Regions:
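RNA-contacting regions in translation and RNA-metabolism proteins
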Residues: 1-46, 56-79
Length: 79
C-alpha cells in the first residue's frame, strides 16, 4: 500500500460514521495517480463537506504530499 493511499484512507476513516466501509483504489499512470475513494452514501456529505471544502482540503494535502515524490495525485470520490 502506498503512503498516499494510506494517508487518504486514514483521513476518510476519521471523517465517516462507517470507517469499515471506506475503500481506496489506486490507479497509477506515468506522472499522475488517481485515488478513488468509496464511502457509503450516508457518509458522502461528510467527505465532501459544505460547498466541497473538506474534499478541497483533502486534495490540497494530497497535492502537497505529492510534490515530495514529484507526482500528481487526483482524488475521485465515488459512491
Amino acid at each position: 500500500m502506498s503512503a498516499m493511499k494510506a494517508l487518504l484512507e486514514e483521513i476518510a476513516k476519521a471523517l465517516v460514521d462507517s470507517p469499515d466501509d471506506v475503500q481506496v483504489t489506486e490507479v497509477e499512470g506515468e506522472q499522475t495517480t488517481v485515488l478513488e475513494l468509496r464511502v457509503r452514501t450516508e457518509d458522502l456529505g461528510k467527505v465532501i463537506g459544505r460547498q466541497g471544502r473538506t474534499a478541497r482540503a483533502i486534495r490540497t494535502l494530497l497535492s502537497a504530499a505529492g510534490m515530495k515524490v514529484h507526482k500528481r495525485f487526483v482524488l475521485e470520490i465515488l459512491e
